[in-house]
Each structure stands twice: as C-alpha cells, then as structure tokens.
C-alpha cells in the first residue's frame, strides 16, 4: 500500500522530529505540523493504541489536513488522530509533545508554543523540538531555559532537541499584550497574541483604513481578515447601532477580537473563525473592509474581495488598504463599479461598489 509519505511528503525537519519521538513510549501525544500531519498518521499506523492531537492555529492548513486525511487515511487511524484548530492546545495532559519550528519563524510565537507544550506535558513527559538550522543556538537556549537537561540529536538537515519534564514551570510568561489607540478622541483597547497580525501595536495600514471610514447609524459592516480586531473595535465604538461581523482564519485573531470587544464593553461585534469565506447571510452588509496580506500572489486578496462581494448588498461598498495598488487597478474595474484608488501616506486606499 502506498505510504502517506509518498502521497504528500512531509517536511524534513518534521520527519527528524518524529524519528526522535518514535524512540520514546507514549499513549497520548500532542503535535503541530507544517504539513498535513502525515507523520502523526504514520505513527498511529504502527502504534494503534496511541492517541494524537494535532494542533493548528490557522484554519487554512487545518482544512487542508482534514481533507487530506479524509481521502488518504483509514477510519481506524482517523479515530485516534484528532485534528483541531484553536487558539491554544487542548488542556489534556500528554506524555509526549512534538514541535517543529522554522529558523525564520516568529520568535515570540515560538517561545509561546514551547511554553504551552511544556505545560501540557505530564511530569516525566518529553518535549521533542526540531529546527531547520543545523547551526542552531537559539532553540537550544530556549530549551535550556525550560528544562534542566536537553539532549541534542544532530542530522544533516536538521537539529532535534529532546528533554524530560521534571517539574511544573515556576515562572509562566504571559505573551498576551494589551495596547491602546485612539479613534476620534475615543481611547480603544485591543488585545493581541503571538501569531496574530501586528502583535503589540496597531498596524499603520489599519490606521489608514480606520481614518478613511465614515459610517452612519445602523450600518452593517463585515471586517474580512480582522486580525486583532482594531478596525472592528473602532467602528463598533463609534455607534452602538453599528453591527460589525469580524471574520478571520486565525483562531488567535478571533480570540483577540473577542477579548477586545469585552475589554471595551462592546456588544455589537460578532466574530467568526473561517478561512473559506463567511457563513454570514449573503447580501446583508453595507460595508466590507479589509487589509489583505501581500503574500501568495494576491490569491488571499482575491479571496477577500470575493468574500466581500458575496456579503455585500447591491450598492454596498468595499474599502481596503494596500501598499501595492497596481494589482487592484487591473483586477477590480471589470468586477466592481465606481472603483477609486488614492494614496494615504505610505499606503493606498481602494474602494469599489458592488454591482
């Protein structure tokens, strides 16, 4: 039978982490993946008594993993492999935790995830962490802060560290941040966490977007890719009759927006975790706002725009911010009415009306 690895090859550093992890005994395992969780499924195939939870923060790769295993993994394996997308790993204690990190990943997110993995371990449980830098020192230093003894496993394409949890952490760092910003003399508080866009401060692009928006009473707004919720919080604060639907594919972004709404005592924000669009009623919004990311050859921007078009009423307005207006100049005029693009400090604002 064709192996899961040949159907979709996992990352080398992830393979190395599982090679080391397979030398330890465990019935309950927590892992992350940069792929589809193929290594976890393969491990279960040869260890049918084990239960593995594979944690995703972002819903897009989570859906990819679910689709992959629905097609390629047996029912017996799927019954012991739990894929889930959430802001934090489940509270259940495990004997083994496996984490793959990237050399150029977000340092604070890596520290946060390492700490969370240690917290989920039983006393005597092991953490296995890998990195794609064979000259790594940073991850080694982080591991030594968490464990009294760290074992180094060296490979040609990766370094893997393993360590045994001997005690609960004496000091638990709080990586969550509260920051404040003003909108029309109103002080607003936002909450952010590692892994959320523009952690610890309001994004300058979001600031340009907020300043450009003028809404009236009872306006229905959808904020696509809400991040920490700064735009949603600002608009909801202006008028209690405004309804804001904030959607993002990142579980932590949705959590932060909810925390921000609670912090500002706002009851007119509804959140949705969704990387595929929105489940909100089609054609029910007056305004769609977005601050699309620049990577993925504008595929995400196109997805945001298509989501906006489905959500807006005929005549509803799209308003987004970008540093790269050329693509929008080419893409929007054939699909939207009254397209207008103008500079705003280091950014450009893009507007259009749904046909």
Residue ranges and their predicted role:
Residues 7-15, 21, 158-220:
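SAM-dependent Rossmann-like transferase core, predominantly class I methyltransferases
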Residues 96-107, 224-231, 285-297:
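Conserved proline-anchored active-site loop of SAM-dependent methyltransferases
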Residues 87-99, 277-288:
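A short acidic, Gly/Pro-enriched loop at the edge of an enzyme's catalytic core
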Residues 141, 145-186, 196, 324-330, ...:
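Class I S-adenosyl-L-methionine
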Residues 111-123, 304-314:
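A short glycine-rich, Lys/Arg-flanked "PGG" loop and its adjoining helix->strand segment in the class I
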Residues 3-77, 204-290:
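Conserved SAM/SAH cofactor-binding pocket of Class I
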Residues 57, 109, 248-253, 300, ...:
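Short beta->alpha hinge that forms the Motif I/post-I loop of the SAM-binding pocket
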Residues 124-132, 315-322:
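Conserved beta-strand signature within the Rossmann-like core of class I S-adenosyl-L-methionine
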